[in-house]
Amino acid sequence: MLLGSVPQLDRVAVQLGPFPVYWYGIIIGTGVLLGLWLATREGERLGIPKDTFVDLVLIAVPIAILFARMYYVIFEWEYYAQNPSQIINIRQGGLAIHGGLIGAVVTGILFAKRRGVSFWKLADIAAPSILLGQAIGRWGNFMNQEAHGDEVTRQFLEGLHLPDFIINQMYIDGVYYHPTFLYESLWNFAGVILLLALRKVNLRRGELFFTYLIWYSIGRFFVEGLRTDSLMLGPLRIAQVMSIGLVVISIIFIIVRRKMGQADKRYSEN
């Protein structure tokens, strides 16, 4: 697709009759499948039946999407109150990661209790998978030309040595923008490598998941400061408030669980 003289990628991957299939959905789905593969592989190594994570994903993903959308709509209620028909329209994006994370954690706790397995063990195994899905999912934002930063020049983007297809896709309505999706995606990919390395350290159970929360939140806090489409609560950027909260809560949980003897088991223990 061409916008003026700048070639751009079409957000529609394929047209099936009257139904468009968007890259956003394909990319999100790819992230989920790769994350599932990573989790089931590690789960089997640690004695978790392969179908455990398959069952969890089948339940958690729809609920996470529902929570992600609800979270987004709540903080954009002024718009959706006037356009209620758009509440269920997620083809153009509008899914908040923090909302999805809340939904996934709630589902994971209930699922683990029903299956009689440790939630912390499942959460530790799933942590790299969740971050991998987030890293891949940001490219869905790229295709939708959303979740970008403030205005920049083409020369600035070229100075980052980015390929032309990224630079061109950051050209929106006659203006170039910060590719904040890319910054967060790269930070998350680095986090996946870190978490995979920390598996070998054999941390106490639950602490790999808290490390994920801390790592992701630090990156999200700084990237969010560059974005122009942040969900707001008065003068506050909601994602930054949530990021600070998650870092603090994670550190507190690590300390308290150790002092109370609730983190005696190690990552690889049954």
UniProtKB/Swiss-Prot annotation:
Subcellular locations according to the entry: Cell membrane
Pathway: Protein modification; lipoprotein biosynthesis (diacylglyceryl transfer)
Cellular-component GO terms for this entry: plasma membrane
EC nos: 2.5.1.145
NCBIfam families named in the record: lgt (TIGR00544)
Protein name: Phosphatidylglycerol--prolipoprotein diacylglyceryl transferase
Family: Belongs to the Lgt family.
Transmembrane spans: 19-39, 56-76, 92-112, 116-136, 178-198, 206-226, 236-256
Membrane topology: Multi-pass membrane protein
Binding-site positions, a 1,2-diacyl-sn-glycero-3-phospho-(1'-sn-glycerol): R138
InterPro entries: Lgt
Gene Ontology biological process: lipoprotein biosynthetic process
GO molecular function terms listed in the Swiss-Prot or TrEMBL record: phosphatidylglycerol-prolipoprotein diacylglyceryl transferase activity
Job of this protein: Catalyzes the transfer of the diacylglyceryl group from phosphatidylglycerol to the sulfhydryl group of the N-terminal cysteine of a prolipoprotein, the first step in the formation of mature lipoproteins.
Keywords: Cell membrane, Membrane, Transferase, Transmembrane, Transmembrane helix
HAMAP family (alphabetical): Lgt
